[in-house]
Structure formats: C-alpha cells, structure tokens
C-alpha cells in the first residue's frame, strides 16, 4: 500500500530478522536507483514518530530511506511487548541493511545508517560492526551516561533483579511509564526529562498508527544499563561519522554528545543545530532545513569518495 502526504510517498514493507521476527517498515523510495539510509526512531518510538520528516527530506534529495518499527514495538513482532533491548536492536540494523541491499531501487554499495536520540547510539554501534555501512549519521545521540553513583545503581539493580525473579516464578512482565506526572524517569537517573519529555510522550500517542503506548517493561532498564556506545567505537575504523548536536539539549547534555564525538578516532564531522532541543530536532520549523542540509552534503560527500 502506498501513501502520499504533502507529496511525500512511502510504501509499507516488512523484512525478517535473523531470529525470524517480522519488522514492519516504511520505504521512502527516491525517484531513481541510488544511495539509501537505514533509519530508526527513538526510544520506544514507532516509525510514524519524528523520523518521517527526515526521511521525506532525504527522499527529496535522491536518497531512499527505510524506517522500521523496532522489535517488540509498534507493528513489528517480538515479545515482551515494548521491551527495549539495545543489543538486539543493533542486530536489527544489520538485518535491515540486508533487506535494503536487495532492493532494486538501492545501490547496495551506497547505504548508510542513521539514528536519532536512543537509536543514534544504536546505529553508531551497528555501523561499527557492519562494514556494509558506508557512513553513520547520529542526531542528538543519547550516550547512555546515567549520571548516578554506584550505590544508586545498586538500588536499581536490586529492584530489577527482584522483578526478574518474579517473572521466573511465572508473573507477567511489569510495565512502567516512560515518565511520571512530574517528568521523572522510573530509575531516577540524572537526566533532565521533565516537561519536554512529558509533552513529547503525549504528542507521540496521536502520531503512531499502531497506538504508541508510553510504557516499557521494567527489564528494559536492565538492558540499557548493560549497553554503551563506547564499547564498539574501536571497531568503527574509517567509516565516516556525522554527529548533529542540538543547541539546547537537556535530555542528553551537549557536553556528553561532544565527549562521544571526541572519542571517535576516524573521519568525522559535527554540526551544532541552532535553536534545537532534544525532542524537537526533527520538527519542521525554521531550523529544520539548516540542520538537514549538512547531513545531505555529508552523505553525498562520502558516497563520492571525498575526504571527510
């Protein structure tokens, strides 16, 4: 089935992961065969949220884009529902790459990875492990820096292990809201989510075709604690990176994103997005095109084999 909104066309598609899950996706085909980007939305988000504005922009510049619902989310397969597993999501980028490489509209030698917020660090890790990715674009990457003490972490681990034991005894997974009424996150990490995240979550409910649900399994947080984008950076090698950093990010402070950028030793570019915050990065305001244009320029520079 094909849809068109404001002259933006996409096709509903699906592909399989190595462990036989079906992931539902949108394919934004360019006007002719050529380069492509594998894209994924943010934490517990679906393909209808945030990323479509970027995909449509890339499409208009001749880049085919694939956005897919992460495993366990939206219309994609996987259980427990809304269990966020960064390690498996890295794997899914590789399977999305395999799918994209087989499409007639795509040049398999000109595919990059793209991610925003949570998925930016997932895409970065995937690019470290998949030599087929010719570049990686990370937009407002969440760096998994929890900003808590060892004692605070132990308290979280005690609660997570207790819930894991409850599941082992036959109880259903426990679900927790992404943010409470005060905008606090359930594991009390030192991150300023507050009003911005709470407002975004309310908006996301109206955007998702499959009904965005603002809860995740409590065990998702165990999986977050076991992941770090820094662990894979040594394998990125000469794959070019572009990082887009919002001027006013409080969800993942600018200095944390720049620290991650500085840890990359290979070819790289950074763009500081004027007027942008973490959760309005892809809103089509007056700052949108100035933020998207450098990404397109970087992408085609890489595809032409020019030095970064």
Swiss-Prot record:
InterPro entries: AB_hydrolase_1, AB_hydrolase_fold, Polyketide_trans_af380
Domain of life: Eukaryota
Pathway named in the protein's UniProt entry: Secondary metabolite biosynthesis; terpenoid biosynthesis
Keyword set includes Transferase: yes
EC number of the protein: 2.3.-.-
Coiled coil segments of this chain: none
One Pfam family in the UniProt entry: Abhydrolase_1
Phenotypic consequence of gene deletion: Abolishes the production of all the sesquiterpene ester compounds.
Keyword vocabulary terms for this entry: Transferase
Biological process, per Gene Ontology: terpenoid biosynthetic process
Molecular function terms from GO: transferase activity
Domain AB hydrolase-1 stretches: 35-159
Family assignment from sequence similarity: Belongs to the polyketide transferase af380 family.
Described function: Acyltransferase; part of the gene cluster that mediates the biosynthesis of various drimane-type sesquiterpene esters, compounds that exhibit diverse biological activities and are widely present in eukaryotes. The pathway begins with the synthesis of the backbone drimenol by the terpene cyclase drtB using farnesyl pyrophosphate (FPP) as substrate.
Other known facts: The various drimane-type sesquiterpene esters produced by the A.calidoustus drt cluster include asperiene C, asperiene A, (6-Strobilactone-B) ester of (E,E)-6-carbonyl-7-hydroxy-2,4-octadienoic acid, ustusolate A, ustusolate C, ustusolide E, ustusoic acid A, (2'E,4'E)-6-(1'-carboxyhexa-2',4',-diene)-9-hydroxy-drim-7-ene-11,12-olide, RES-1149-2, as well as the 3 newly identified compounds calidoustene A, calidoustene B and calidoustene C.
Listed PANTHER family: DLTD N-TERMINAL DOMAIN PROTEIN (AFU_ORTHOLOGUE AFUA_8G00380)-RELATED, SUPERFAMILY HYDROLASE, PUTATIVE (AFU_ORTHOLOGUE AFUA_2G16580)-RELATED
Protein name in the entry: Acyltransferase drtE
Origin organism lineage: Eukaryota, Fungi, Dikarya, Ascomycota, Pezizomycotina
Encoding gene per record: drtE
């Amino acid at each position: 089935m094909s849809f068109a909104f404001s002259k933006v066309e996409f096709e509903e598609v699906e592909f399989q992961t190595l462990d036989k899950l079906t992931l539902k996706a949108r394919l934004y085909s360019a006007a002719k065969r050529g380069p492509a980007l594998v894209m994924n939305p943010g934490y517990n988000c679906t393909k209808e949220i945030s990323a479509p504005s970027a995909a449509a922009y890339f499409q208009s510049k001749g880049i085919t884009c694939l956005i897919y619902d992460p495993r366990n989310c939206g219309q994609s397969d996987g259980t427990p529902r809304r269990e966020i597993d960064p390690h498996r999501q890295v794997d899914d980028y590789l399977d999305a790459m395999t799918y994209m490489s087989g499409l007639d509209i795509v040049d398999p030698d000109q595919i990059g990875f793209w991610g925003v917020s949570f998925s930016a660090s997932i895409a970065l890790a995937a690019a470290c492990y998949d030599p087929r990715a010719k570049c990686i674009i990370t937009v407002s990457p969440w760096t998994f820096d929890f900003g808590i003490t060892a004692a605070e972490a132990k308290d979280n681990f005690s609660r997570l292990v207790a819930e894991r034991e409850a599941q082992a005894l036959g109880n259903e997974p426990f679900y927790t809201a992404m943010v409470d009424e005060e905008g606090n996150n359930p594991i009390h990490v030192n991150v300023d989510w507050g009003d911005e995240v709470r407002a975004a979550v309310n908006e996301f409910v109206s955007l998702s075709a499959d009904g965005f649900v603002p809860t995740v399994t409590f065990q998702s947080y165990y999986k977050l604690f076991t992941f770090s984008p820094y662990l894979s950076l040594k394998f990125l090698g000469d794959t070019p990176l572009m990082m887009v950093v919002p001027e006013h990010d409080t969800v993942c402070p600018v200095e944390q994103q720049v620290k991650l950028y500085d840890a990359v030793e290979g070819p790289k570019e950074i763009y500081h997005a004027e007027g942008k915050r973490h959760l309005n990065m892809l809103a089509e305001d007056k700052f949108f095109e100035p933020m998207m244009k450098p990404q397109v320029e970087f992408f085609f520079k890489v595809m032409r084999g020019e030095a970064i």
